[in-house]
Each structure stands twice: as structure tokens, then as C-alpha cells.
Amino acid sequence: MSKNNHANHSNHLENHDLDNFSKTGYSNSRLNRHTMYTPEPKLSFDAMTIVGNLNKNNAHKLSEFMSVEPQIRLWDILQTKFKAKALQEKVYIEYDKVKADTWDRRNMRVEFNPNKLTHEEMLWLKQNIIDYMEDDGFTRLDLAFDFEYDLSDYYAMTDKSVKKTIFYGRNGKPETKYFGVRDSDRFIRIYNKKQERKDNADIKIMSEHLWRVEIELKRDMVDYWNDCFNDLHILQPDWKTIERTSDRAMVFMLLNDEEEWGKLERRTKNKYKKLIKEISLIDLTDLMKSTLKANEKQLQKQIDFWQREFRFWK
């Protein structure tokens, strides 16, 4: 995210309203999404990539510093390039002037997960590495919402037409859901974080459940981190409340076989997406939006920390 664009991103709003189709019959007892209590998720930036340019003088200074700094491991070192890891392998750094000139892009990249860095390590990284860069900005931000309950029974969908991929666990329930493709400007992952950590022999999680909704933003989309999932819905639709038999059968089929969506034309897809939202007691993305709104200033301070003169956020 360039510094010039920084002030403009909050003005970006998109209208994701669906076409106004005639209402399809469902139970007379209208559902109220606010009748169910759901604990707020924990919200954080889970990955960051900052790119910028090293001028010749700063490249020489940084290379000299990194070659003697014990917290840095350097390799692939030439006059116009180097790769490094820092702070116990928690930060990846790459500089390549030739590649940058060839592809007309900035020549240095720093990747890290801010959740894994202490305040002291953040300060070290900013002062000793990132502050050497000019014209720096974010090219990737991952927004992570952690829920301490089971999301395997929730139905996730988007108003937009994006690729959806589902992986199932040994119990036959969904364990990972992807929306979009990895190289797109926005890639959404919904997955069983507790199972992932168990599989990786990572930190033991005491909670009975831990699921993550992760929104990976790249390139221009990083400017809209606070308005990036208006089209996403995470629902618990009750198909049995639909009165019309044909619609009830269609919704049941769509909820249980993702491939059936591909057989519908656009207006029919939108009709049933609208109906599925209407028969759900809860949409977790409403809770995600309110959590994001409550933490927006705090998250903005984290972005400001890396890009300008700063004080630590409180």
C-alpha cells in the first residue's frame, strides 16, 4: 500500500447488493440473525509483505550490517542481490536489483508474521531493515479472524462468482474451504486451525475448537483491508423452513453438492443465494464486520507503525 494511497482507502465502498428478485416462499416465522449469541472472534494481521527500493548507498550499508549481525542469516549474496532470514527465521528478506529493473518493480521485499514478533523485534526490524527502503509500501496483508467454535457445519458462500474449493477431513466434514485462487488479489481461506497445528506438531491449543477465516489481500487490494469481504457469508441455513417443496429440494441439493451451482444460470443462482441467506439464523460475517469496525483504529496504527514515524499502538 503506497503512502499516497493510504488516506484514500477508507473512502472505497462497493455496493454488493443482489438483484431484487421476487420473494420465494419460506416459513412465516421470519428469522432474526441477532437472536443467537456468538462470541467475538480474535482479529489480527497474520502476514505482511512490505516492498521498497534500496538505493546503491543504502544497499551497501545494509549489506555490511547484515553480514555481521548475529540475528541475520545471509545467503545467495552478490553485488546486486542477497537473501536473508532474521530474528530466528521469522523474517524473510530479499534484494534483487537486476530482477527489479527487468520487471520494473521495487527491488527489496520483507515478509513476516507480526503475531510472531515481540515489540522489541518489531522495532529492531523497522529501524535496522525497513527504514533503509524508499518508496516502501504493503503488497500483502492477511486479515485473520479466529473463532473458538466449530465452523465445519457452517455454509460459506460469496455473492461474487469465484472459484470455491473444499477439502474434507477424516470425519467427512469440511476442514478447509478456499474462495478464489492463490495468485488473485483476494484469496479467502476458512480452515480448522486447531487441526492444522496438530498436524504440524505446533503449539498445543487448549480450546475445544479453533477455526480461522483468513483473507489474503495482495497488490491494490491491500488498500481496502477494512472493506474486503462484503460479499462473503458464513451461514447456518435451515432448509426445512422453506415451504415450497421445489425450492426446499433445490436448496438442499445446493447445500450438499457444490457442483450443482455450476448448472444454474446467473439469475437463478442469485435467487437461491438470497433464499439461503434468508433462512439462516446467523451470518458470521456480520460479527466479523462489527469486530473489524471495533478494531479498525488499532489495526491502522499497526500499518502506520511500519510506514512512517511512529509510536507503538496501545
From Swiss-Prot:
One of the GO biological process terms: DNA replication
Superkingdom field: Bacteria
InterPro entries documented for this protein: REP-like_C, RepD-like_N
Region: Disordered, residue numbers: 1-25
Polar residues biased stretches: 1-10
A Pfam family this chain is assigned to: RepD-like_N
Keyword Zinc-finger included in the entry's annotation: no
Biological function: This protein is probably a specific topoisomerase involved in initiating replication. This protein is specifically required and may be rate-limiting for replication of the plasmid in vivo.
Name this protein carries in UniProt: Replication initiation protein
Source species of the chain: Staphylococcus aureus
Biological classification of the source: Bacteria, Bacillati, Bacillota, Bacilli, Bacillales
